[in-house]
Amino acid sequence: MEMINKENLSSQAKLWNFIYGFADSLVLKSAVQLDLANIIHNHGSPMTLSELSLHLPSQPVNQDALYRVLRYLVHMKLFTKSSIDGELRYGLAPPAKFLVKGWDKCMLGAILTITDKDFMAPWHYLKEGILNDGSTSTAFEKALGTNIWDYMAEHPEKNQLFNEGMANDTRLIMSALVKECSSMFDGITTIVDVGGGTGTAVRNIAKAFPHIKCTVYDLPHVIADSPGYTEINSIQGDMFKYIPNADAIMMKCILHDWDDKECIEILKRCKDAVPRDGGKVIIIDIILDVKSEHPYTKMRLTLDLDMMLNTGGKERTEEEWKKLIHDAGYKGYKITHISAVQSVIEAYPY
């Protein structure tokens, strides 16, 4: 009887944690909005509640509310709590370093993008995606009345937030790619980053390999929001209509936005854009392995649902990637796993 009660208690606790799972995301969002990690980091040592209060963006501060949020952040193991000279002080646990501004692995943009009210809205339409009413609309379209691409073009402030979030993710990926896959760029003199956003990814390549002429290629409203890095060229266009020629075409987190038919169309255009002698397409995307015990497995499965809801796309297993590349008329591929959520697929058209 005692064992059954313990099992019930554990099961109920698990369900309650699922029910309130959103709390972790939104408490994290509030910590970012209040700039708590940067305040403590800039102070140089753990801070008391009253010290933290004095540095918040507006006064007066509800210290009881702040205390309770900090208590939750400590339980999340993002912040630390210690007693120094008889006073309770709050510091930063290791994961909180990714909340500190000013370094290439800062994740603030990604946090604010993913927890934005509009970007969370499609998750409320997951049921409708399963009980298909004959509609081809994505959950994003059901929630916000338009597809994600038109929404971004019509809401420049959200587009900027989205681009900042993607740039955060890109910096994490490209840091690993450049360090762990440098031989991938041997023999390449030109590369085009298709759907490359504001140019963060290809700029990392330009810095690491100055001899490579790097170009970012994306929609006009995306290029318009680009900082205009001097190391790279920018071209506006639509990948379904034209892809500029280069020794290598790179696509980071692009194909997961689309269904198989559209991916094959994109891959065929990429094939036409690279030379027969040594040309290749570099795909940076997730490879699903549901049996894996990797720390990123749950996140990869979450991103698969995210793609389904927002774009109608999907994350793919290696077998699905193999079929996609074969159906696009490519001769072969090579997979390299890197220290990131994504892996690298070198697809060889000829």
Curated annotation (Swiss-Prot):
This protein's name: (RS)-norcoclaurine 6-O-methyltransferase
Catalyzed chemical reaction(s): (S)-norcoclaurine + S-adenosyl-L-methionine = (S)-coclaurine + S-adenosyl-L-homocysteine + H(+); norcoclaurine + S-adenosyl-L-methionine = coclaurine + S-adenosyl-L-homocysteine + H(+)
InterPro entries: COMT-like, O_MeTrfase_dom, Plant_O-MeTrfase_dimerisation, SAM-dependent_MTases_sf, WH-like_DNA-bd_sf, WH_DNA-bd_sf
Keyword field: Alkaloid metabolism, Methyltransferase, S-adenosyl-L-methionine, Transferase
Function, as annotated: Involved in the biosynthesis of coclaurine, a precursor of benzylisoquinoline alkaloids. Catalyzes the transfer of the S-methyl group of S-adenosyl-L-methionine (AdoMet) to the 6-hydroxyl group of norcoclaurine to form coclaurine.
Gene3D superfamilies, per database record: Vaccinia Virus protein VP39, Winged helix-like DNA-binding domain superfamily/Winged helix DNA-binding domain
Subunit annotation: Homodimer.
GO molecular function per UniProt: (RS)-norcoclaurine 6-O-methyltransferase activity; O-methyltransferase activity; protein dimerization activity
GO biological process, one term: alkaloid metabolic process
Keyword match Transferase: yes
Record: active site: 256 (proton acceptor)
Record comment: activity regulation: Inhibited by sanguinarine.
UniProt-listed Enzyme Commission number(s): 2.1.1.128
Claim: Translocase is one of the keywords in the record: no
